[in-house]
A protein has these predicted regions:
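Flexible, glycine/small-residue-enriched loop-and-beta-strand segment within the central core
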Residues: 2-68, 94-95, 100-103
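Short-chain dehydrogenase/reductase
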Residues: 56, 74, 90-92
């Protein structure tokens, strides 16, 4: 279920994969491209976002491109996800960091 106010990158929306039983709450942003600092001017790089089954994403989370959020993971409110999250773990913060494992 995707709640109101979720922002999905409109440049490459086909690069976002969302599994079954996923809950994405209001204010979350999902990004599929980023500015390439090694290039002059404005040059974007594309990356996919994979959100596996039974993930819960709290309020106002930013999910950066080129990440996978593993099955059953929980992402705390206000987090910025910049790297892969393993299955059945709780992560939170800016940048998001490991908090603890959760029951499977």
């Amino acid at each position: 279920m995707i709640y109101g106010g979720v922002g999905v990158d409109t440049v490459y929306p086909d690069s976002i994969y969302i599994g079954k039983g996923v809950r994405i709450t209001a204010g979350t942003k999902i990004l599929t491209h980023y500015l390439d600092p090694s290039q002059p001017g404005v040059h974007f790089l594309r990356g996919e976002v994979h959100i596996e089954d039974d993930v819960f994403i709290g309020l106002n989370v930013c999910i950066c491109s080129s990440v996978t959020i593993g099955k059953g993971a929980i992402i705390g409110a206000g987090s910025v996800v910049t790297k892969d999250i393993p299955p059945y773990q709780v992560w939170a913060g800016n940048p998001a960091r490991y908090i603890k494992d959760r029951a499977k």
